[in-house]
């Protein structure tokens, strides 16, 4: 086959010798197909453009007319005004308005329910559709507009308008919040894209808003970088971080001479770091203590807070975080020198103590020396020595009238501290040290050998106290008293009077004639547990002979009688002449300590006394044997705990009444007698000789009538009916009781004393040398029951 034949038929398959021609053919064919496709697309696009142009050109005239009406709003308003005037029956007004506004007057007659295009000649415009309403659309629109306007401008409005307006505001507020959060989310996304940390995450704006507000929700998007989606930190509560320091309660009075010592550390609420750094020998005023009574059940009838700078106790002022162990650290000098065991609770007489002093020798001297340094008010760390209650194994710190321990001026403030001192409440704030042991030397010997220090800062003492002999380097004797308070069930008077106690340091009496019993004074650690208190149902726990489970006396005292103390000369005027001059500024007080020792070795060592007598225990440091008490009102009854009824002695041992005048009304005549024929004592001053009582029943001094086991109150002829003349000296063995006039007159149970006759006259009650028989139990109980501060005026120990 020739080439021409093949070349003449281009559609035929070329020979294999010509491969280039075949490939070129294929390319030409593909290019032709593409050109045909492009031409078809171009044709379609042209057709679409033509159609769109035709649509814009062929738009309906209605849309153009509406646009014209919107552009001519005044004409629309005129139409609605004309409609309102026509429907309001204002035809003349409507015709005049149509003429002036160039409106068709027949417009009102035409139906308005549909659109009607009416072309008028001249300047007439095409009217649009007018909404048909009963009173005209303009009027109804105006009502709605005015109601909404009043609601939005806070001028009132209807209830529906107010609800609608609140819904509109809420919707707008939500849209605004969402819009702002969306903008913030877009900003975060944009920042992440710029840092290259965005990986097509979608952030929910509402979730992001919750995260930004600090709500505990999962993060909106788990970002790869922590800084992209930080966890919100809650606000710090200020009640935890605002720990303000408590300033110290400093109420130092310049007249008291108390020098305020600046604290070494700033005051704060933590008590653990302040106590050990303070000097215990100073008047520590930097301790942050509370001055509010934490226990309202404690004896504080007035309710005044006490000054806790120096006299803070645990009874009325308890700091919530103030523990005894963390407040103070025990110094080496605070350890008690001679602390006997709890077995040594029996009392010892003065004679046995004198014998023990001789036998002790050098040991007793060293012991006395150490004890003197312990009690010394002028030592470096001397504080309040401890006074042991009879029968108790724990010591109560007593107030020492020294410059170290400064008491507040207020008596009520002192009462808070005195309660804890006497009745077992430990005073963790006081600068206390161990009390001296009485094994080596008697308190009278210590008082005679060691002179007391004159107090510079004198303050009033409110209640009775345990007096303690205080020693110092300076010479001179002064009154040094401790203070105690009444038990919680005692009625405390609000009078701020100052009883006085004469503390005679001249040991002129023989120790064998002192007739005093001293319980073995035990001074354990100051942080030891307080003694257990015995529940007392009586309103006033009194002086109970033979009772070793409670203090001997718990009666608050009152003012000083005029016959005993001369404020001008500063001396005590007694029957035997003026006593040793005391500091008139110092107000001391003393309890009536009467206790009966138990039978034992100490009882056998005591000299035999007259049967039927009791032993009066003077306070610590007194070298006297006589006691003067001024009573305002008191009556004698028998003890309720008497089990064996005994008869009064016969003959001359009957109870003899001694009558004396009031020491404040007539000082010179104290032994005025009454006639034996008197059935009832008519004088306000009367007394009874207790030395004549041998084995009778127990005696009580309450505000009650006399009652005996063998006699009725109206048949008590041995007490008040038989009187005889008897004198009383300062050192004799007789006991003179001078109660008020109602002692003898209120013998019947129907006659009761009142508060009016209790405060009529103050009488003197004097106890002489009263002892006790050897190997014999207590015969009498001397109690003061149902009394208060108004029943006592004065307690005076004479020596």
From Swiss-Prot:
One of its GO terms (cellular component) is nucleus. The keyword DNA-binding does not apply. Residues 41-55, 307-317, 341-353 have a biased composition (Low complexity). The keyword Glycoprotein does not apply. Signal peptide: none annotated. Residues 1-22, 37-68, 101-127, 255-406, 431-501, 568-621, 644-691, 705-758 are annotated as: Disordered. It is found in: Nucleus. Its main location: nucleus. Belongs to the FLO8 family. This is Transcriptional activator FLO8. The gene is FLO8.
């Amino acid at each position: 086959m020739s080439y021409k034949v093949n070349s003449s038929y281009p559609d035929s398959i070329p020979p294999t010798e010509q491969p280039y021609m075949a490939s070129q053919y294929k390319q030409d064919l593909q290019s032709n197909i593409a050109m045909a496709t492009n031409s078809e697309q171009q044709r379609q696009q042209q057709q679409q453009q033509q159609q769109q142009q035709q649509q814009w050109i062929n738009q309906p005239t209605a849309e153009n007319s509406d646009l014209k009406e919107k552009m001519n709003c005044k004409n629309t308003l005129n139409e609605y005004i004309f409609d309102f005037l026509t429907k309001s029956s204002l035809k003349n007004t409507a015709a005049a308005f149509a003429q002036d506004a160039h409106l068709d007057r027949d417009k009102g007659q035409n139906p308005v329910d549909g659109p009607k295009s009416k072309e008028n000649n001249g300047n007439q415009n095409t009217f649009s559709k007018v909404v048909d309403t009963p009173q005209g659309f303009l009027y109804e629109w105006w009502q709605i507009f005015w109601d909404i306007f009043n609601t939005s401008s806070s001028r009132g409005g209807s209830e529906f308008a107010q609800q609608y307006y609140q819904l509109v505001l809420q919707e707008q507020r939500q849209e605004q919040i969402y819009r702002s959060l969306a903008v913030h989310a877009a900003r975060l996304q944009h920042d992440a894209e710029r840092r290259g940390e965005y990986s097509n995450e979608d952030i929910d704006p509402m979730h992001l808003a919750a995260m930004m507000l600090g709500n505990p929700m999962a993060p909106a998007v788990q970002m790869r970088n922590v800084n992209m989606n930080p966890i919100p930190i809650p606000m710090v509560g200020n009640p935890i971080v605002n720990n303000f320091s408590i300033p110290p309660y400093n109420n130092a009075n310049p007249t008291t001479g108390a020098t305020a010592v600046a604290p070494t550390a700033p005051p704060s609420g933590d008590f653990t770091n302040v106590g050990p750094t303070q000097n215990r020998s100073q008047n520590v005023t930097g301790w942050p203590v509370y001055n509010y009574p934490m226990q309202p059940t404690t004896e504080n009838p007035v309710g005044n807070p006490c000054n806790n700078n120096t006299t803070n106790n645990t009874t009325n002022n308890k700091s919530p975080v103030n523990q005894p162990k963390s407040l103070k650290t025990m110094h080496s000098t605070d350890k008690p020198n001679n602390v006997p065991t709890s077995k040594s609770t029996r009392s010892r007489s003065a004679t046995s103590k004198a014998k023990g002093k001789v036998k002790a020798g050098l040991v007793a001297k060293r012991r006395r020396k150490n004890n003197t340094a312990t009690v010394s008010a002028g030592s470096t760390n001397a504080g309040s020595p401890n006074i042991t209650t009879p029968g108790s194994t724990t010591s109560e710190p007593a107030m020492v009238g020294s410059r170290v321990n400064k008491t507040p001026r207020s008596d009520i403030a002192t009462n808070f501290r005195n309660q804890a001192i006497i009745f077992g409440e430990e005073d963790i704030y006081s600068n206390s040290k161990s009390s001296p042991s009485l094994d080596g030397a008697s308190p009278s010997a210590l008082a005679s050998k060691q002179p007391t220090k004159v107090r510079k800062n004198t303050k009033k003492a409110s209640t009775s106290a345990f007096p303690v002999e205080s020693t110092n380097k300076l010479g001179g004797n002064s009154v040094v008293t401790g203070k105690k308070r009444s038990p919680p069930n005692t009625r405390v008077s609000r009078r701020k009077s100052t009883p006085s106690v004469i503390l005679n340091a001249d040991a002129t009496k023989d120790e064998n004639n002192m007739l005093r019993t001293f319980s073995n004074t035990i001074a354990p650690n100051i942080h030891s547990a307080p003694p257990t208190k015995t529940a007392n149902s009586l309103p006033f726990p009194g002086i109970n002979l033979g009772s070793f489970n409670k203090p001997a006396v718990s009666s608050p005292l009152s003012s000083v009688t005029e016959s005993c103390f001369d404020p001008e000369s500063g001396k005590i005027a007694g029957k035997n002449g003026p006593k040793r001059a005391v500091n008139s500024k110092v107000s001391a007080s003393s309890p009536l300590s009467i206790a009966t020792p138990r039978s034992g070795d100490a009882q056998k060592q005591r000299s035999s006394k007259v049967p039927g007598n009791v032993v009066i225990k003077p306070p610590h440091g007194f070298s006297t044997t006589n006691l003067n008490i001024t009573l305002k009102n008191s009556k004698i009854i028998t003890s309720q705990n008497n089990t064996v009824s005994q008869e009064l002695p016969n003959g001359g041992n009957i109870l003899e009444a001694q009558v004396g005048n009031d020491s404040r009304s007539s000082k010179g005549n104290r032994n005025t007698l009454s006639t034996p024929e008197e059935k009832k004592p008519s004088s306000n001053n009367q007394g009874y000789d207790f030395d004549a009582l041998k084995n009778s029943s127990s005696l009580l001094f309450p505000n009650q009538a006399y009652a005996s086991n063998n006699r009725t109150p109206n048949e008590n002829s041995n007490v008040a009916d038989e009187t005889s003349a008897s004198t009383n000296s300062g050192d004799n063995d007789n006991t003179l009781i001078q109660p008020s006039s109602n002692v003898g007159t209120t013998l019947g149970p129907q006659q009761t004393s009142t508060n009016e006759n209790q405060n009529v006259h103050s009488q003197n009650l004097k106890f002489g040398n009263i002892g006790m028989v050897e190997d014999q139990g207590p015969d009498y109980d001397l109690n003061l029951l149902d009394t208060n501060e108004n029943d006592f005026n004065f307690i005076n120990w004479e020596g």
